[in-house]
């Protein structure tokens, strides 16, 4: 949960509720190098989303691709984002230049793991699944975040209200489940 974040689109300022999803990467890159840190831990990659379930929302599109089927209206109403914790997927990652000119790896697509790969066996996850909610912050988890992520959360009106600085906006209600059948897809 990143709280409500200010962004600009087509010259207009917007304030939208944002979330971040992260994935632990397993496997090798295009050159055959293991996807690990210098310590040998799996690399991780993250993608920020607007918390929106509209038909064109990137969050909904990626989740539907991950499930390999669209959500019904009923599934969308009861979808709980936490049901994806620990669910395996395949990612399409592309290089993209940042505003500072540096190249970054961005998640372009999410897909289910093909059954032939599942049947061969998936590696065990190394890092624990974690959820951070501004409404009920885990301060120990918050302290593990990098400076940039902390600053982003701290600038949200929800965090400001929690710290007694400003009034929080009305909360955006997220629907609940739809990944209950993730293992079967």
Residue ranges and their predicted role:
Residues 1-185:
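Short beta-rich binding modules
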């Amino acid at each position: 949960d990143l709280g409500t974040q200010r962004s600009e689109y087509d010259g207009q300022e917007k304030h939208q509720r944002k979330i971040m999803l992260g994935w632990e990467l397993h496997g090798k890159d295009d050159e055959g190098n293991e996807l690990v840190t210098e310590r040998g831990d799996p690399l991780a990659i993250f993608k920020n989303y607007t918390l929106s379930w509209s038909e064109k929302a990137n969050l909904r599109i990626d989740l539907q691709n991950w499930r390999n089927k669209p959500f019904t209206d009923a599934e969308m109403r009861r979808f709980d984002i936490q049901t994806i914790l620990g669910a395996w997927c395949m990612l399409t990652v592309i290089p993209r230049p940042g505003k500072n000119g540096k190249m970054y790896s961005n998640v372009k697509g999410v897909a289910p793991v093909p059954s032939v790969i599942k049947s061969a066996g998936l590696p065990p996850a190394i890092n624990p699944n974690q959820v951070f909610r501004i409404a009920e912050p885990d301060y120990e988890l918050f302290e593990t975040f990098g400076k940039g992520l902390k600053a982003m959360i701290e600038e949200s009106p929800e965090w400001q209200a929690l710290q007694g600085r400003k009034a929080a906006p009305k909360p955006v209600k997220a629907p609940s489940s739809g990944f209950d059948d993730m293992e079967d897809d």
